[in-house]
Amino acid sequence: MRYLKKLAWFISVIILGIFIIGCDSSSDTGEKAKEDSKEEQIKKSFAKTLDMYPIKNLEDLYDKEGYRDSEFKKGDKGMWMIYTDFAKSNKPGVLDNEGMILNLDRNTRTAKGYYFVDTIYDNHENSYSKNYRVEMKNNKIILLDKVEDQKLKERIENFKFFGQYADFKSLKSYNNGDVSINSNVPSYDAKFKMSNKDENVKQLRSRYNIPTEKAPILKMHIDGDLKGSSVGYKKLEIDFSKEENSELSVVDSLNFQPAKKNKDDE
């Protein structure tokens, strides 16, 4: 009888031990599930703005709130800065770069910026840069400076930002990225292989002269806190470059920052 009681007690201890271990294990699994990988954190940080794409009417940004911190003055509704450029090196040591930057002030509901044309040499001696002032009204780009080159004028007036036609609803499907982190800045980078079947890639090929059939790399770069920062920035690059010494890429960014600056910043 005593033997049976000891056996029953021994079995009870074993079952209790298994139950406790099982609880700890499930708890650890739960904790790990809560802690996203850096890759997931980077994608989630970008998703805050990429989920708004495509922004077919840029004036919708006047009614969109962004990340706010202590850098914003009281009453400042903030400003959206949208940017797209296309960079291409037609010959070694020379980079041609064209694009536009537009600042949409939510306080005044006005949008001003410029279209830029840059030719950059490695030695910088003969580098060339020209800006053409623009504004946006009724979702239409209006050229404020006189432009003699008719083709350039048409490119400016018909310009579309990447964010106006890009669609990243399937951002979660980009996996197995190459992630690098610089804790001193801090800055975060993630690279993902894209497919030529990707709709964003097809859109870019239809709008820009991209002679290579090479599938591009999607590069995500963040300066500042992953959770958000008005002094940091995020940059998206779709890189079609064949090799290290050549450059063929589209860069896009959409950032929210204070519209009213401190006197010390001016």
From Swiss-Prot:
Residues 1-22 form the signal peptide. It is a lipid-anchor. It is found in: Cell membrane. Keywords: Cell membrane, Lipoprotein, Membrane, Palmitate, Signal. GO terms for cellular component: plasma membrane. Gene3D superfamilies: 2.50.20.40. A lipid is attached at C23 (N-palmitoyl cysteine). It comes from the Bacteria. A lipid is attached at C23 (S-diacylglycerol cysteine). Belongs to the staphylococcal tandem lipoprotein family. NCBIfam families: SA_tandem_lipo. This is Uncharacterized lipoprotein SAUSA300_0411. The lineage of its organism: Bacteria, Bacillati, Bacillota, Bacilli, Bacillales.
